[in-house]
């Protein structure tokens, strides 16, 4: 089953504007749909294409790359081995899972300069040290990030009218409690299923939530296998599994030692960066002084980690049992889980901000005369100012942190939002918006 993906539109732009001078690399975590997008693009937009999947190709194909000094012979061998005819300026060559054969990635420089065909690569763990240590990274390569399906893509796949949300946002008015509850339930389905195409396909095909959960567990197992290939000790996997617990504690930052114990700091940091490079997690950095610049005041020692897919986050929350039962999902969909799930909604917001093309930032500072801290969950730049976001699963409470932030940085703030399950509204200078309208706030 193929779903409409935004990355496809970006590939169309690449083909029209850049394909003569650059290859394009679809980069992202495993199982986000890179290979499917690539092959559908090739089928629809080119006269012919050759797909080389380096996870299962033949030794004869690999031997073609031993000598690319004579590209005429190289292309003849490829056509002979695959039985596919290439047409100049009308054919695409796909290097799928290119991280498994770095020599092919290095060849991109010469292939692009040759100019006869277009080139598309897909890769996961593409930046991991062992996958790039012996090659020259080609400058003739444009990177295109592929994420799990966002809420708009999910609505398109499931037949929900995402355009209606745009109209609600444009109206600037509250929609009413009954409709708001319905729209929040729709969003919670997305949170429960997530955006991994295999999980979405299972949902579209009518599978129950326990069956969908098994699909997501298989993806997590695949990630764990990848982590062990990078570090056999299992510490990267421990860092990954610790994310829900860290967020549940409402800690001001992620602590590596809590997940893997006290180890060599340098080695632990290397493992952390390998985890981040896998694209399975989203780092959110503390901006020490939002007055100046979020990027320039990024504290690399103070950060939080979120999962790149909220559906996987739900499964990881209950990974201690053999399968997450339908009953748990039913309670999640009806908002009746006994736990405070503010951190689950935080992960949703982190994912939504990331797919908009932005980095994640938060801000925390000491409360005078107290051992407690204020914290604003997310900050984004808007021209020369910033927008601040506080995330609440319920919407009730004093919202002390964001109000104090507004006082402290009044000259630097454009808008301050409370994102919750409640309908749109306003409390003094605080704008109240439901989660399903967040994508329109950060466009």
Per-region residue spans from a language model:
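Short glycine-rich substrate-engagement loop in P-loop NTPases that contacts/grips substrate
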Residues: 56-89
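Hydrophobic anchor at the beta1->P-loop junction of P-loop NTPases
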Residues: 26
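Structural recognition of the conserved hydrophobic beta-strand(s) that form the central parallel beta-sheet
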Residues: 94, 118-124, 145
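Interdomain hinge/linker elements that couple catalytic modules in large macromolecular machines
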Residues: 159-345
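Short regulatory helix/loop adjacent to the ATP-binding pocket of P-loop NTPases
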Residues: 110, 127-143, 155-160
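Conserved lysine of the Walker
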Residues: 34
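A cross-kingdom feature that marks ATP-driven nucleic-acid transaction machinery
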Residues: 15-16, 22, 31, 40, ...
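Pre-Walker A adenine-sensing motif
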Residues: 2-18
């Amino acid at each position: 089953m193929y779903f409409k993906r935004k990355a496809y539109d970006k590939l169309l732009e690449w083909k029209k504007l850049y394909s003569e001078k650059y290859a394009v690399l679809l980069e992202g975590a495993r199982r986000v749909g890179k290979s499917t997008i690539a092959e559908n693009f090739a089928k629809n937009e080119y006269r012919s294409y050759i797909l080389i999947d380096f996870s299962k190709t033949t030794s004869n194909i690999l031997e073609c790359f031993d000598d690319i000094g004579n590209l005429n012979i190289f292309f003849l061998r490829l056509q002979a081995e695959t039985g596919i005819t290439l047409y100049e300026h009308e054919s695409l060559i796909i290097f799928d899972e290119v991280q498994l054969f770095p020599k092919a990635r290095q060849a991109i420089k010469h292939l692009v300069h040759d100019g006869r065909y277009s080139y598309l690569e897909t890769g996961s763990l593409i930046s991991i040290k062992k996958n790039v240590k012996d090659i020259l990274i080609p400058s003739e390569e444009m990177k295109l990030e592929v994420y799990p399906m966002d809420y708009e893509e999910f609505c398109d796949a499931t037949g929900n009218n995402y355009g209606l949300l745009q109209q609600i946002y444009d109206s600037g008015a509250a929609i009413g409690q009954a409709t708001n509850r319905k729209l929040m339930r729709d969003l919670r389905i997305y949170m429960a299923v997530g955006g991994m195409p295999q999980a979405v396909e299972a949902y579209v095909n009518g599978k129950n939530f326990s069956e969908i959960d098994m699909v997501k567990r298989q993806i997590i197992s695949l990630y764990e296998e990848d982590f062990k290939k990078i570090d056999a000790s299992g510490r990267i996997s421990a860092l990954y599994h610790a994310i829900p617990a860290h967020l549940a504690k409402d800690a001001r930052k992620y602590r590596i030692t809590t997940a893997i114990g006290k180890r060599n700091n340098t080695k632990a940091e290397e493992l952390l960066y390998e985890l981040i490079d896998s694209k399975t997690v989203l780092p959110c950095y503390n901006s020490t002084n939002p007055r100046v610049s979020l990027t320039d005041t990024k504290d690399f020692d103070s950060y939080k980690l979120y999962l790149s897919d909220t559906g996987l986050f739900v499964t990881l929350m209950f990974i201690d049992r053999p399968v997450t039962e339908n009953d748990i999902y039913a309670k999640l969909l009806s908002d009746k889980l006994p736990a405070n799930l503010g951190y689950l909604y935080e992960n949703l917001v982190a994912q939504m901000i990331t797919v908009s093309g932005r980095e994640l930032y938060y801000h925390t500072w000491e409360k005078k005369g107290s051992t407690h801290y204020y914290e604003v969950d997310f900050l984004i730049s808007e021209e020369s100012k910033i927008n601040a976001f506080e995330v609440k699963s319920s919407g009730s409470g004093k919202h002390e942190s964001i109000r104090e932030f507004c006082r402290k940085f009044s000259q630097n703030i454009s808008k301050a939002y409370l994102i919750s399950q409640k309908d749109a509204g306003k409390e003094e200078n605080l704008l109240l918006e439901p989660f399903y309208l967040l994508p329109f706030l950060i466009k």
